[in-house]
């Protein structure tokens, strides 16, 4: 248990940051899920639109420290491959 005032404040800050990160991670998952649905339905136009919406969300999460930048780049790359394969 946090005893010093600074430790108590740190606990509050960590709790607030955790909530923000959960929200950002959930938002990323939602955008990726919409893209997955578009890919599975085979709708090229919807997949393209969903990809253009999901990519900045992934990179924003990386820049905010929610996920590592290499993880975000890998996810973007793999999703782009799938969108490209759908268009071909």
From Swiss-Prot:
Similarity field: Belongs to the bacterial ribosomal protein bS20 family.
PANTHER family hit by this protein: 30S RIBOSOMAL PROTEIN S20, SMALL RIBOSOMAL SUBUNIT PROTEIN BS20C
Keyword rRNA-binding: yes
GO MF entry, a single one: structural constituent of ribosome
Keywords: Ribonucleoprotein, Ribosomal protein, RNA-binding, rRNA-binding
InterPro entries listed in its UniProt record: Ribosomal_bS20 (IPR002583), Ribosomal_bS20_sf (IPR036510)
Disulfide pairings: none
UniProt entry tagged with the keyword ATP-binding: no
Stored Gene3D superfamilies: Ribosomal protein S20 (1.20.58.110)
Protein name as annotated: Small ribosomal subunit protein bS20
Listed SUPFAM superfamilies: Ribosomal protein S20
Gene name for this UniProt entry: rpsT
Recorded GO CC terms: cytosol; small ribosomal subunit
Signal peptide span: none
Described function: Binds directly to 16S ribosomal RNA.
GO process annotations (BP): translation
